[in-house]
Amino acid sequence: MKKILLMLVVLFTMSTNVFADGLTATLQQGDVMTPFYGVNAFKEAYDAAQDGAIITLSSGKFNDVSTISKQITITGASAFFADNSERTILESTTIAANNIKIEGIYFLKTVTLGTSTLSRIENCTLKRCQIGSSLYSNHIHENTLVDQCAIPSVQAMEKSKNFCIKNSTIDHFYGMNSATNIAYISNCVVWKFVCYVSNTYYSLPYAIYKNNYLGIYKSDDSKKYFTLDSPSEYYNNVFCPSYMKRDYEDSDPYSFIEYVTINYGSGCANNDNIKGNQKFEKLLEQPAHPIDAPLGSDGTVVGPYGGTGFSEYPAIPRIISKSIDSNSNAEGKINVKITVKAEQ
């Protein structure tokens, strides 16, 4: 175990340092690691990969693998840093196999779940990823997990089964599921959960909603009430009403509804209703950063959503501190201290 951890630390350090000269993709199959370099490194590593392989990508923008049809894990350096030189960037991709896990990647456009040639895909995970456009599916996908992601539009509800989204920021949902395939959504920020624009509501998928910030976003304040429909269930959520002014030249383009009346049906408990500016300094941010984010047992910020927390870093070891003595000791040795952390 220690040997594997050390190899990963060395690998990750090399991958970040090599970025100055080029892009790196490292393919791990069993105990064998193979590096690939350049803008096509990801494609070359993927072509050489077999089911069960792990591909680790450095920071930088790689050429895409348009369809991922092998049961593999793909891990990037990060998806969230403002400086693109620190992100792992892909244009888009389609997930077309079971048991695919993707983590720490910034997709500029769309991630698609499933293809017309497959009856379904199962057990796929997106973790700590940011998507520029949408998470889309018009195909059956089962046991999909989205965790600690930032996604403008989720268009993957209709044919989902056991779809779980947690610790994530979503702008809005588009497309509807049914009472037979309700989702599970927890510890998320949904900016336009109830979105009333141009006399039209956005889709409001059926789900069990727990511990979320759910935004009520409208282009005017003519509708100050909303009814939560079954079979959805709502527990310990905070509803955050806000709407955009029509005067887009205003230096502060957001105004806030003083109240929204929520009509709670059965299956609802311990929900609250506050104005959006009481919980967020900046609306519509991806990912969201609520005020007074909860703390963990050691006093560190758990994440903007609570729950299991939110981290910008993927689950590969990274060096968080290092100390190297400038002089050797009496035995002629130099003390080196390295602290390594890996997210869960």
Locations of regions flagged by a protein language model:
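Short, compositionally biased P/S/T/A/G/V-rich stretches that sit at domain boundaries
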Residues: T300-I334, K341-E343
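Right-handed parallel beta-helix/beta-spiral solenoid domain characteristic of secreted/periplasmic
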Residues: Q71-T115, R128
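Sec-dependent N-terminal signal peptides
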Residues: I4-M14
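Acidic Gly/Asp/Thr-rich repetitive segments characteristic of extracellular carbohydrate-active
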Residues: A25-N63
